[in-house]
Amino acid sequence: MTNLRKTHPLMKIINDSFIDLPMPSNISAWWNFGSLLGMCLIIQILTGLFLAMHYTSDTLTAFSSVAHICRDVNYGWLIRNIHANGASMFFMCLFLHVGRGIYYGSYLYKETWNIGVILLLTVMATAFVGYVLPWGQMSFWGATVITNLLSAIPYIGNTLVEWIWGGFSVDKATLTRFFAFHFILPFIILAMVVVHLLFLHETGSSNPTGLNPDSDKIPFHPYYTIKDILGLFLMIIILLLLAMFSPDLLGDPDNFTPANPLNTPPHIKPEWYFLFAYAILRSIPNKLGGVLALLMSILVLLIIPLLHTSTQRSMAFRPISQTLFWMLTANLIILTWIGGQPVEQPYIIIGQWASISYFTIIIILMPLAGMLENYMLKPKFP
């Protein structure tokens, strides 16, 4: 009798993707974040579904409905806290996943990389519209400030902003449509994840050395299933510790106050995972320039494959590129810190220097380092 796993049309796809998939034998824990992101997405969709059952997307009752979920719904507080902190885990895994891709040259699988960047943008959009839903002060003012950025677009800007608002300010129409977007986008993300995996399985995974791994492959199951489960358990433990012991650690205290259009919070800032981009936005005095820099801070990832000058794929054996990579990491941490600070000196100038160095490292220094390393590796015999 033939094995159903290998003959059934549907089981065969699952088998070729998660069971008999040939994998490089030497991929490290940095390759765990793909499966962790998949799990984050599933957790977010499930908790979000249960929250949507009790949430009302009306300006008068949205804030109260969230309070009702936490007080009156069975384990509603837990579902809400897992959903809110799950977003933080999602972005933490995303940043590490993208960082791994840059360090080990995974961006050379261009199709996988490009759909990954589009995925990152879609997840960011989903998180933004989701943050508006509790209808607290920071939800309202965050929505007002960020949607207002579109007014910087010449000629059509103001019309576009009012079209997105569904009126002349952020109001009931805005909240309702943001809820609709927040509900539909995760399913679009899910479809894009399938495409992301489809492109990845065309080429197979890269590995820490950057060398061709074809000569040494092992099956995904049981080796990497058990490894992924270990990573998953660790992530769930961290998520539950965060959600149960300090659920408001990463949130903004202003969001415990219901939205009030007549009262502006002293410091309008997004969640921690957007602070680096927010710092880049604020570091440019011109509105349109700031918006373009904000977009470029993410879209610059799309040109990274074109800027690869090294003869080696991975940074594992490239000390100069490694130094630049960790400088970039430190730079992003500085930008994240600056994004949460008020707009005053010395934060303004630090933010401006950090923004300049962010783009300089990626666009200029990394390609130059690759060329320098190529030159240093050439034999210099007379």
Swiss-Prot record:
GO molecular function terms listed in the Swiss-Prot or TrEMBL record: metal ion binding; ubiquinol-cytochrome-c reductase activity
Pfam families tied to this protein: Cytochrom_B_C (PF00032), Cytochrome_B (PF00033)
Cofactor note as given: Binds 2 heme b groups non-covalently.
Amino acids binding heme b b566: H97, H196
Membrane-protein topology: Multi-pass membrane protein
InterPro entries from the UniProt entry: Cyt_b/b6_C, Cyt_b/b6_C_sf, Cyt_b/b6_N, Cytb/b6-like_sf, Cytochrome_b, Cytochrome_b_C_euk/bac, Cytochrome_b_N_euk/bac, Di-haem_cyt_TM
Residues that bind a ubiquinone: H201
Cross-referenced PROSITE patterns: CYTB_CTER (PS51003), CYTB_NTER (PS51002)
Superkingdom of origin organism: Eukaryota
Protein keywords: Electron transport, Heme, Iron, Membrane, Metal-binding, Mitochondrion, Mitochondrion inner membrane, Respiratory chain, Transmembrane, Transmembrane helix, Transport, Ubiquinone
CDD domains referenced in this protein's UniProt entry, alphabetically: cytochrome_b_C (cd00290), Cytochrome_b_N (cd00284)
GO terms for cellular component: mitochondrial inner membrane; respiratory chain complex III
Necessary cofactors: heme b
UniProt-annotated location(s): Mitochondrion inner membrane
Binding locations of heme b b562: H83, H182
Single GO biological process annotation from the record: mitochondrial electron transport, ubiquinol to cytochrome c
Transmembrane feature ranges: 33-53, 77-98, 113-133, 178-198, 226-246, 288-308, 320-340, 347-367
UniProt record similarity statement: Belongs to the cytochrome b family.
Additional information: Heme 1 (or BL or b562) is low-potential and absorbs at about 562 nm, and heme 2 (or BH or b566) is high-potential and absorbs at about 566 nm.
Quaternary structure note: The cytochrome bc1 complex contains 11 subunits: 3 respiratory subunits (MT-CYB, CYC1 and UQCRFS1), 2 core proteins (UQCRC1 and UQCRC2) and 6 low-molecular weight proteins (UQCRH/QCR6, UQCRB/QCR7, UQCRQ/QCR8, UQCR10/QCR9, UQCR11/QCR10 and a cleavage product of UQCRFS1). This cytochrome bc1 complex then forms a dimer.
Function in brief: Component of the ubiquinol-cytochrome c reductase complex (complex III or cytochrome b-c1 complex) that is part of the mitochondrial respiratory chain. The b-c1 complex mediates electron transfer from ubiquinol to cytochrome c. Contributes to the generation of a proton gradient across the mitochondrial membrane that is then used for ATP synthesis.
Protein name: Cytochrome b
Native source organism of the sequence: Philander opossum (Gray four-eyed opossum)
Lineage: Eukaryota, Metazoa, Chordata, Craniata, Vertebrata
